[in-house]
Amino acid sequence: MSKVLKVGLLLLLVAVAASAYAVAEENGAPKENKQLPQIDDYGVTNKCPANQPFKWNCNYCTCGPEGKDASCTRMACPQH
């Protein structure tokens, strides 16, 4: 692979990463200083505050419009 192609691919990767970060910020990604409700039993009850962000264990979620079926990050949480 030529050096020019490698540099081009690297620049493309950086641009995609920067775009993804900007979109996450626009979509209201949780800020570290923002206090979100912690719902530890979401995995059992599947209930959450409709259309609201919350934390489930170490993951960030946004609840669905009917108060269930949230969309969450999928980080592996450390065991306590």
Swiss-Prot record:
**Family assignment?**
Belongs to the protease inhibitor I19 family.
Q: What does the tissue specificity note say?
A: Expressed in the venom apparatus. Low transcript levels are also detected in other tissues.
Q: Which residues form the signal peptide?
A: 1-24
A single Gene Ontology CC annotation of this entry is:
extracellular region
Q: Where in the cell is it found?
A: Secreted
Q: Which residues cross the membrane?
A: none
Domain of life per record: Eukaryota
Originating organism: Nasonia vitripennis
Q: Name one Pfam family in it.
A: Pacifastin_I
InterPro entries from the entry? Answer: Pacifastin_dom, Pacifastin_dom_sf
Keywords carried by this UniProt record: Disulfide bond, Protease inhibitor, Secreted, Serine protease inhibitor, Signal
Q: Which residues form the propeptide?
A: 25-47
Q: What is the protein's name according to its record?
A: Small pacifastin protease inhibitor
In what residue span(s) does the Pacifastin domain sit? 45-80
Can you name one GO molecular function term for this protein? Answer: serine-type endopeptidase inhibitor activity
Question: What are the disulfide bonds?
Answer: 48-63, 58-77, 61-72
Per the entry, what this protein does is: Parasitic wasp protein that may interfere with the host immune response. The recombinant protein inhibits trypsin activity and prophenoloxidase (PPO) activation, an enzyme essential for both clotting and insect innate immune responses. It does not inhibit activity of chymotrypsin and protease K, and has no effect on phenoloxidase (PO) activity.
